[in-house]
Design a protein with these regions (language model features):
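Hydrophobic hinge/microswitch elements
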Residues: 128-133, 137-141, 146-147, 197-255, ...
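Central regulatory/effector-binding core of bacterial HTH transcription factors
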Residues: 90-153, 221
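Secondary-structure junction motif
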Residues: 176, 190-211, 278-287, 293-304
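Alpha-helical linker/hinge and terminal dimerization helices associated
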Residues: 42-43, 64-86, 299
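Flexible hinge/capping segments at coil-to-helix
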Residues: 152-191
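Short helix-boundary/capping micro-motifs
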Residues: 10-28
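A short LG(V/I)-centered, amphipathic sequence patch enriched
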Residues: 18, 40-57
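C-terminal effector-binding regulatory domain of bacterial HTH transcription factors
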Residues: 242-253, 261-307
């Protein structure tokens, strides 16, 4: 089993066609076919089911493709790090973020990388914490920002920020960032919240139980843009971190107020897989995320406590 065979396996598995893989790799079809046959002979089982419309991975083939992708990625990272040792950062980084963080941070981070490290290829994954953890464990994600993760032996965790949540209402409600709202007062609000698997919903409901406060949730949406749109249409109020709505508050379409007694807060962390070395490009992403978050805190765009 060699690097060339694994690369061929990955491309045929992705394209489902020997001819398409040959065109992509600029290698003759018979040569690719011999590589796959050699792999199958070595392993002792078919890696593809062959039919008139192409080639489909078997269960063994799918498993080997997953491992091969990790190997090929590590080889590329090693090459990029060797080049980067001369001071020029290059390579690729897959960064995972919860939706509320992605809307706040991804654009800023992408611009900074484009300006400072144009040879780094970034890919962003926006998903819930459970999916991001799975991506880290499977090595599909290099670095993730997570909310309040439970202890995971497979992850290396670095605290980033303790974030405050705010009541967000239409602009005409005239909520003020200088006039906090009591948590129990939320019982009088028509609330629009994310679904039950979202960390904001879980946190709000936890504090509601602790405060013996009954909330009136009339609509659910896991999309940040939908929640903001619904609030601007005066369908109700929601609960979000301040950076999510900072621009809307400046424009006057939304207003917000801190929540107290108790104050719902979430802890954000940076996470990487413990069984994987951090590439130079990934380490640079860690540094830039910390820098961007610190700048937003200093400008009162992101309200919270740096950790």
């Amino acid at each position: 089993m060699n690097f060339r065979q694994l690369r061929t396996l990955v491309h045929i598995g992705e394209l489902g066609s020997l001819s398409k893989a040959a065109d992509r790799l600029h290698v003759a079809q018979p040569a690719l076919s011999r590589q796959i046959r050699a792999l199958e002979d070595e392993i002792g089982t078919p890696l593809f089911t062959r039919h008139g419309r192409g080639m489909v991975l078997t269960q063994t083939g799918e498993l080997l493709v997953e491992r091969a992708n990790n190997i090929l990625r590590q080889v590329e990272e090693a090459r990029a790090d060797a080049i980067s040792s001369g001071g020029w950062v290059r390579g690729s980084v897959v960064i995972g973020m919860p939706p509320t963080v992605a809307d706040i941070l991804a654009g800023r981070l992408a611009k900074e990388f484009a300006d400072q490290h144009p040879d780094v290829n970034l890919r962003f994954v926006s998903a819930f914490t459970s999916h991001l953890i799975e991506g880290l464990q499977k090595r599909n994600i290099d670095l993730a920002i997570l909310y309040d993760p439970k202890s995971h032996g497979s992850l290396h965790i670095k605290p980033l920020l303790q974030e405050d949540l705010f009541l967000v209402a239409p602009g005409k409600a005239k909520l003020s960032l200088k006039k906090p709202v009591s948590f129990k007062d939320l019982s009088a609000e028509t609330l629009l919240l994310p679904g039950g698997q979202h960390s904001i919903r879980q946190l709000v409901e936890y504090h509601a139980r602790e405060a013996d406060c009954e909330l009136k949730v009339t609509m659910e949406a896991d999309s940040l843009s939908l929640l903001k749109n619904f609030v601007s249409l005066e369908l109700g109020s929601t609960i979000l971190p301040l950076p999510s709505v900072y621009q809307n508050i400046e424009e006057g379409s939304l207003s917000a107020a801190p929540i107290i007694d108790p104050s719902p807060t979430r802890t954000l962390v940076l996470a990487t897989a413990t069984d994987r070395a951090i590439s130079n490009a990934t380490q640079r992403a860690v540094e830039m995320i910390k820098q961007e978050v610190a700048e937003m805190i200093a400008k009162n765009i992101w309200v919270g406590l740096p950790l």
